[in-house]
Amino acid sequence: MERFELLARLGFAPPEACRMRVIIDTDAKNEGDDDFAILHHLLTPQFDVRGICATHFEVKTTQRGLPPHSMERSYQEVCRLLNAAHIDDVPVLHGCTAPLASPEDAPDCEAVEFLIQEALRDDPAPLYIAAQGAVTNIAAALNRAPEIASRMTVLWNGGGPYPAGRPEFNVQQDPIACRVLLDSAVTVWQIPVSYTHLRAHE
């Protein structure tokens, strides 16, 4: 079933004038919250979800003795989720399998090529990258094609609480990629970890 067919069945019609392109970059197998975020994107009528890129959480798997190949497990989790939702028109891309080796590292993979291709597409709709894990794929794409920086906006769920800061999970999975992203010319909307927590009013 196509995503917009599902939206139509739910009574939603995507307003073309407000359409924005979205690519989701996710470590979906790491925690269950990514699945909810993915479905939220897919069921938002204004979002033209162009694809979903799987990213790794290899630092966690190494430190905690968990099964390796975290990117592949995230890829399979996204496929499972789309299958359960009967959505078959959104491509899922394999991402980088490990953190960047250096600030100049530019590994090639399906996700990196897809990010570059979509950023360079001749399309008036703005492109947003919803980053829900390590930003390795995005940083590698910026290293391979710096010209895409002005053609997309990255919404990054990562970084310690503002303004004090502290080590944070998504940063720890690839701190070099975070530095590449923040040093680039791309517009970044950062959502620190403290803004993802619900708290009672004091």
Task: Give short role names for the model-derived ranges.
Residues M1-P14:
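Positively charged, low-complexity intrinsically disordered leader regions
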Residues D34-T44, A139-N143:
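Histidine-anchored nucleotide/phosphate-binding helix
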Residues I116-A149, L155-W156:
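Internal, conserved structured core segments that host functional sites
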Residues M20, L43-R121:
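Glycine-rich nucleotide/cofactor/substrate-binding loop typically near the N-terminus or early
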Residues A111-V112, T136-N137, L155-L182:
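Active-site glycine-rich loop that binds ribose-phosphate moieties when present
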Residues T196-E202:
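Conserved small/polar residues in nucleotide/adenosyl-binding loops
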Residues I24-D33:
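Short, glycine-rich nucleotide/cofactor-binding loops
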